[in-house]
C-alpha cells in the first residue's frame, strides 16, 4: 500500500496562489490541502486589499463543530465580529508580525475579513466535510459580492483599521 503524499506549504506555492488571487475578480484565492469530503479542512486563503468577504457565520449539524481557526502567516488582516443586526462588536488586527497571529472563532460567530496588506495569507482549519450550499450563512442586509455597495463597504472597513 502506498502512503499518501507529504504536502508542503512553500513560499513558491504561496507566491503562485497570491498571483492567482491578484488575477481573480474576487481578489482572493484558496488552495486546499484537503479533499472536500475529509473531516478536517486545511487550506490557505490569500487575500488582496479590496476583497469583499460578505459577513457570515458557520452553522453545522450537531455532530460537527462549526469553529474556524485562522493563522496569518504572511501580511495583515482585519477581522470584524458582528451581531445578528450587523453591528460591530469587535475589530481585531491579526498579523504575521504579531502581536496577534491567530484567532479561533466559535461556531455561529458572525464575521468578515479585511486584507490590510497585499498577499495576506491565512492558514485555516475547520471541521468538514465541505458542503458548498451549507458552508456559510450570510448575514441579511449586506450586499452581494461584486456590487458597488460591497466595494464601498470594504473601503469603510479598511478605513476603520487604518485610522
Task: Name each model-derived stretch.
Residues 55, 79-81, 103-105, 111-116, ...:
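Short beta-strand His + acidic residue motifs that chelate non-heme Fe in jelly-roll/DSBH
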Residues 87, 112-163:
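Double-stranded beta-helix
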Residues 66-84:
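Glycine- and acidic-residue-biased ligand/ion/polar-headgroup-sensing regions
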Residues 43-45, 62-72, 103, 113-114:
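His/acidic/aromatic-lined binding-pocket segments of jelly-roll/cupin-type domains
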Residues 1-44, 92-95, 156-163:
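A short, N-terminal "cap"/entry segment at the start of jelly-roll beta-barrel domains
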Residues 26-27, 45-64, 96:
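Conserved short histidine dyad/triad with adjacent acidic residue
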Residues 43, 51-54, 75-81:
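Short beta-strand segments in beta-sandwich/barrel cores
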Residues 83-111:
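Short acidic-glycine-tyrosine-enriched beta hairpin
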Amino acid at each position: 500500500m502506498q502512503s499518501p503524499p507529504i504536502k508542503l506549504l512553500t513560499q513558491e506555492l504561496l507566491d503562485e496562489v497570491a498571483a492567482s488571487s491578484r488575477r481573480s475578480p474576487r481578489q482572493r484565492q484558496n488552495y486546499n490541502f484537503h479533499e472536500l469530503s475529509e473531516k478536517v479542512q486545511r487550506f490557505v486563503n490569500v487575500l488582496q486589499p479590496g476583497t469583499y468577504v460578505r459577513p457570515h457565520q458557520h452553522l453545522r449539524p450537531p455532530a460537527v463543530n462549526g469553529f474556524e481557526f485562522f493563522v496569518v502567516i504572511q501580511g495583515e488582516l482585519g477581522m470584524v465580529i458582528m451581531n445578528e443586526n450587523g453591528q460591530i462588536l469587535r475589530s481585531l488586527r491579526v498579523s504575521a508580525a504579531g502581536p496577534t497571529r491567530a484567532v479561533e472563532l466559535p461556531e455561529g460567530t458572525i464575521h468578515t475579513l479585511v486584507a490590510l496588506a497585499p498577499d495576506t495569507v491565512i492558514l485555516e482549519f475547520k471541521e468538514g466535510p465541505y458542503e458548498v450550499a451549507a458552508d456559510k450563512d450570510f448575514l441579511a442586509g449586506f450586499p452581494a459580492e461584486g456590487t458597488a455597495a460591497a466595494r464601498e463597504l470594504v473601503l469603510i472597513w479598511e478605513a476603520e483599521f487604518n485610522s
